[in-house]
Amino acid sequence: VLLINLKWWRENNICNNFIEYLKCHDNLKFVDQDILNGMFYSSRKLIPFKWNVQDGFLRRKPKIRKSCIPTLQNEIKSPAIIHYTGSRKPWDYDCINPYKESYFKYLDMTKWKHTRPYMPLKFKFKLMLDKVLYFLYLKPRKYIKISK
């Protein structure tokens, strides 16, 4: 998540600086992110996790520094921005992100109200079976449980 001072960017000709950076670094994997990280690393400001709650933060074993986990666990309970990262998006029938329903809450405020992905019967059965296995502690959950 980015908060950008566009006036400052324009006054400091940042777009041209991006182009120059790209000319000197032609092997970037995530071009936009790599340029931003390379140019602004020393002046970046970290924001609380609740402003960028990502899929990896919601896993039972979060992909984050261990020292940050207590803060993260508190902040993901009431996110300000849910960033649906990763390959499975809430509009995919096989998404099991705990905040999937939040996506549909806001989708229902648009002209696509009540639009839901088609879920094959086979997957519905798998979801029910997984719930039983979680309940009996025979299968670990991939995601933490979010209290509503």
Spans of model-derived segments:
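A glycosyltransferase accessory/donor-loop signature
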Residues: I4-K148
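A recurrent flexible, glycine/aromatic-enriched loop bordering the glycosyltransferase active site
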Residues: V1
